[in-house]
Amino acid sequence: VVGGAECKIDGHRCLALLY
């Protein structure tokens, strides 16, 4: 998973990585 840890730290970054 790309940015799995990032998602927990910043939900907005998680969305950015998903797209």
UniProtKB/Swiss-Prot annotation:
Temperature notes for this entry: Optimum temperature is 30 degrees Celsius with tosyl-Arg-methyl ester (TAME) as substrate and 37 degrees Celsius with natural substrates.
UniProt superkingdom: Eukaryota
Location(s) in or outside the cell: Secreted
Regulation acting on activity, per entry: Inhibited by PMSF, but not by heparin, hirudin and antithrombin-III.
Domain Peptidase S1: 1-19
Entry keyword set: Blood coagulation cascade activating toxin, Calcium, Disulfide bond, Glycoprotein, Hemostasis impairing toxin, Hydrolase, Protease, Secreted, Serine protease, Toxin
Known tissue expression: Expressed by the venom gland.
GO MF term list: serine-type peptidase activity; toxin activity
Annotated Gene Ontology cellular component terms: extracellular region
Flavoprotein in keyword set: no
Entry PTM: Glycosylated.
GO BP, one annotated term: proteolysis
Catalysis: reaction(s): Preferential cleavage: Arg-|-Xaa bonds in fibrinogen to form fibrin and release fibrinopeptides A and B
Keyword match Disulfide bond: yes
Primary role: Thrombin-like snake venom serine protease. Releases both fibrinopeptides A and B from fibrinogen (FGA and FGB) to form fibrin clots. Also activates factor XIII (F13A). The activity of the enzyme is stabilized by calcium ion.
Family to which this protein belongs: Belongs to the peptidase S1 family. Snake venom subfamily.
Subunit structure of this chain's protein: Monomer.
Protein name: Thrombin-like enzyme gabonase
Originating species: Bitis gabonica (Gaboon adder)
Lineage: Eukaryota, Metazoa, Chordata, Craniata, Vertebrata
